[in-house]
Amino acid sequence: MRKRNVRGICAFLCTILLECLIPAGEVQAQRALDVARERGYQLEERYQPAGSIITEINTGQILWQENAQKQWPPASMTKLMTILLAYEEIKAGNLELESTAEVNERYTDIAGRYALSNNKMQPGASYTVAELMDLIIVPSSAAATYMLADMVESDPDRFVERMNQKAQELGMVNTKYFNCVGVTNNLLQPYHPVSQPLDGDNITTPEAVSYTH
């Protein structure tokens, strides 16, 4: 519950920053939390983002940035890379949005782990690629991410290699993936990529995950 509350506050801070429409050059000395407080919002210090960036999607113009090159764990944003790789497989003709996968004991085990964001899964149930993508976005399902990743690449270690290769292709410097979910590998045992360390935690920067056309 606390994680969801923090996410909501961070989204709220982004909204405040967008409303301010302050040129990036004028806000470098200010923190996101300070901007919100100046406008009458009383927020605790723990809601100050470690780093942030807001860009105009079509032009790439930076509207706001704060510690945009600071490395930090992307958490569930990691799962977007799985969706991207799945779309590439669709484009290559290796997958379709209607392609299906069946829930097995591995996926139900992952779905039952309370330390992970998930959805309930019943053994034998089938999901299409499109349905798995929806579950990855909301409710950020770890089990759905595993299912989709396995459809793209059956070897978890090879899948992580592909994640890192794609990150390099996209120019995502200072980024390293250790798994497809966005938690430390010890929370995923025994399903973590065995070539990766148990304390491996994905790392990136706000700048690397900002999106523009």
Region annotations inferred by a language model:
Residues 212-213:
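Conserved small/polar residues in nucleotide/adenosyl-binding loops
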Residues 29-206:
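Active-site-adjacent loops and short helices of periplasmic peptidoglycan-processing enzymes
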Residues 2-12:
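Bacterial N-terminal signal peptides that target proteins for export
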Residues 19-26:
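C-terminal segment of classical bacterial N-terminal signal peptides
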